[in-house]
C-alpha cells in the first residue's frame, strides 16, 4: 500500500507556508538534523537561491556549505529572519516541544529566540499529548562539574543519564563544549515548572524544552500532505 514520507511532506509544507504568509528567507537560521536538510533541498528544488544561513552546529555548517549556502558566523549576527528546525516531540495544543536529540540544543535555542519567524517541521509520529512521553528531555551542562550537576538533578527526582555515543568513548559533548545529559522524566504535567526548576540548577547551561518559541509547526502525514499547527504567537496565515 502506497504512502508518503512524512518528513518530505513537512518540508514541502513549510515552504508552502512561507509563500502564503509572504515570508522572506533573508538571513536564515537552521537547526540540526536530517529534517532541516530536507527543507533546504526542497527549497533548492523550487529554485530558491541559496543566501546566508546561520547554523546551529558545525554539522549544519558543513551541510549548508555543501548545498551552496553562505554560512553566517553566529558570533556576528544579532538575529535571523526565519528559523527552521525539526523537533523530537511536539505538543499540538500549545506548540511546546522537546529538542536536542542531535546535541545542538544550545545553538538551536539561541537562534530560535533571536528569530522573527520560527517554523518547526515534524512527522506525525512526533506529536504527543504531553512532552516526555516518547523521548527524554536533554540538558547541556558544564563539563567540569558533571558529577555535581548530576547529583543535583538526581535529588530533584529527574532521573538523569549522561548521553553516550557508539562512535566515541565517554559522554556526548556539544559543539559548545557542554556535556549532554538526558532526563528520563516521563510525561510532563508542568513543562514550564520543569524549565524553571532546571534554570535554578547551577551548572545547567540550557534545556531542550522549547516553550513559547514556535510560530508554526508543520506536520507531515504518511497518508500524504501536511497540516499546519498554529499560529502560536499571534501570527496569522
Curated annotation (Swiss-Prot):
Keyword Isomerase attached: yes
Pathway: Carbohydrate degradation; pentose phosphate pathway; D-ribose 5-phosphate from D-ribulose 5-phosphate (non-oxidative stage): step 1/1
Family of this protein: Belongs to the ribose 5-phosphate isomerase family.
GO molecular function: ribose-5-phosphate isomerase activity
Gene Ontology terms: biological process: D-ribose metabolic process; pentose-phosphate shunt, non-oxidative branch
Domain of life (superkingdom): Archaea
Subunit structure: Homodimer.
Residues at the active site: 108 (proton acceptor)
General function of this protein: Catalyzes the reversible conversion of ribose-5-phosphate to ribulose 5-phosphate.
Enzyme Commission code(s) on record: 5.3.1.6
Catalytic reaction(s) noted: aldehydo-D-ribose 5-phosphate = D-ribulose 5-phosphate
Swiss-Prot/TrEMBL keywords: Isomerase
Protein's UniProt name: Ribose-5-phosphate isomerase A
Class of enzymatic activity (EC top level): isomerase
InterPro entries: NagB/RpiA_transferase-like (IPR037171), Ribose5P_isomerase_typA_subgr (IPR020672), Ribose5P_isomerase_type_A (IPR004788)
Gene3D superfamilies tied to this protein: 3.30.70.260, 3.40.50.1360
GO cellular component: cytosol
SUPFAM superfamilies per UniProt: D-ribose-5-phosphate isomerase (RpiA), lid domain (SSF75445), NagB/RpiA/CoA transferase-like (SSF100950)
Chain sites annotated for binding substrate: 32-35, 85-88, 99-102, 126
Disulfide-bonded cysteines: none
